[in-house]
């Protein structure tokens, strides 16, 4: 995923 949503960036963590 190129674009990283604010809510998604926490998911990646």
From Swiss-Prot:
Keywords: Pyrrolidone carboxylic acid, Secreted, Vasoactive
Positions of modified residues (Pyrrolidone carboxylic acid): 1
GO cellular component, one term: extracellular region
Places the protein is found: Secreted
GO process annotations (BP): blood vessel diameter maintenance
Site feature Cleavage, where: 10-12
Coiled coil start-end: none
Function statement: Smooth muscle-contracting peptide.
Family: Belongs to the neurotensin family.
Subunit structure: Interacts with NTSR1. Interacts with SORT1. Interacts with SORL1.
Name of the featured protein: Neurotensin
Originating organism: Trichosurus vulpecula (Brush-tailed possum)
Name of the gene: NTS
